[in-house]
């Protein structure tokens, strides 16, 4: 009796896995579209960070941009912060990172992202999501009222999640692939 249940359960799991695998395969054309969407979201995040960090941005506008930026991330994502003055890397929730960025003690802040590129191809995970990593370089410049400057360039690795989602449009359920950003890890900081 136990063997029949075990064999039946094994077949059910095997067929369910094959059906799920067939649904989750991404065609090369779809993968190019997903890659393009992921890079677009990374560029959007770079613009949002620049706006949030700028001292010329009004408080209400910065908060509106924070809300928009948070929509790009998977729940629980964290962002790494580093400095030339310490080897420690501190991680904050995305919202806390944006709040700290907005409150930086500089009179002028300039943040630019460049050299954005995939460093790992999307890989299918057991939960059905695809995961990849995009690397960016961030140039940070902060200037105080008395002219003191801090500058660094940080290499950051951004986890990218691609998952199938569902929505209803005109009463019909539609499936689509969406891209969410995950943790942003600091891999190198230099002058």
Residue ranges of model-derived segments:
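Short solvent-exposed beta->alpha transition segments
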Residues: 62-110
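Bacterial Sec-dependent N-terminal signal peptides
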Residues: 1-28
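Long amphipathic alpha-helical segments
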Residues: 86, 111-122
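Coil residues (strongly favoring Ser/Thr
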Residues: 36, 83-86, 153
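Short, charged, low-hydrophobicity "junction" segments
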Residues: 19-24, 103-114
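Short, low-complexity N-terminal intrinsically disordered segments enriched in polar/charged residues
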Residues: 22-65
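Exposed beta-sheet edge and beta->alpha loop/turn motif
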Residues: 117-191
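Short glycine-rich, low-complexity/disordered patches
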Residues: 51-54, 58-67, 111-116, 172-180
């Amino acid at each position: 009796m136990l063997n029949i249940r075990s064999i039946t359960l094994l077949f059910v799991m095997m067929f369910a896995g094959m059906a799920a695998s067939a649904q989750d395969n991404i065609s090369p054309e779809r993968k190019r579209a997903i890659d393009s969407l992921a890079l677009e979201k990374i560029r959007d995040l770079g613009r949002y960070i620049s706006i949030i960090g700028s001292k010329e941005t009004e408080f209400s506008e910065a908060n509106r941009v924070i809300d928009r930026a948070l929509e790009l991330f998977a729940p629980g994502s964290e962002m790494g912060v580093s400095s030339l003055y310490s080897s420690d890397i501190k991680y904050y929730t995305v919202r806390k990172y944006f709040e700290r960025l907005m409150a930086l003690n500089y009179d002028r802040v300039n943040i630019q992202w460049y050299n954005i590129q995939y460093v790992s191809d999307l890989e299918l995970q057991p939960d059905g999501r695809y995961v990849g990593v995009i690397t960016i370089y961030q140039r940070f410049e902060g200037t105080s009222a008395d002219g003191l400057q801090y500058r660094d360039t940080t290499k950051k690795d951004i986890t990218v999640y691609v998952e199938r989602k569902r929505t209803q449009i005109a009463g019909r359920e539609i499936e689509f692939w969406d891209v969410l950003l995950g943790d942003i890890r600091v891999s190198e900081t230099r002058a």
